[in-house]
């Protein structure tokens, strides 16, 4: 299955998602925002999430596949003051996604569309059997 990839996600967030509860995550890294910009929420919309950095993402890396429940991209204006006379105004883009755990996954192939393009992956859902 081919889907967008979110990289550099905290292992604690991935652990919480594996517990089965939907979570809302705020993304501020540009490459992750670009990766989810074209993702439409729905039961057939999946994203691969991993704690591996984008530069190190290769076939064989492990992560999780999640279902996208909601997305929003917004711009925040920030003003910083220094010494009472100087101030700097900046804008910061961020994205919020609500996701729910689907399955553990392994990367089969990585598709990179340049520095400012989205990163997507071909993933295989992992099967786990327990002897009883």
Features from the language model and the residues they span:
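Short, solvent-exposed loop/turn segments at secondary-structure junctions
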Residues: 11, 53-55, 73-74
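Short coil-to-beta transition motif at edge beta-strands of beta-rich domains
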Residues: 35-57
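Compositionally biased, charged N-terminal/linker segments
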Residues: 1-42, 132
């Amino acid at each position: 299955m081919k889907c967008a990839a979110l990289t550099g996600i905290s292992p604690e967030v991935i652990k919480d998602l594996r517990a089965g509860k939907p979570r809302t995550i705020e993304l501020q890294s540009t490459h992750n925002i670009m990766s989810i910009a074209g993702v439409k929420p729905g039961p057939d919309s999946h994203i691969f999430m991993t704690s591996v950095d984008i530069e190190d993402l290769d076939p064989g890396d492990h992560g999780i596949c999640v279902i996208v429940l909601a997305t929003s991209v917004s711009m925040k204006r920030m003003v910083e003051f220094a010494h009472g006379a100087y101030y700097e105004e900046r804008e910061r883009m961020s994205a919020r996604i609500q996701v729910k755990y689907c399955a553990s996954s392994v990367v089969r192939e990585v598709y990179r569309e340049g520095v400012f393009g989205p990163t997507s992956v071909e993933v295989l859902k992992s099967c786990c059997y327990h002897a009883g």
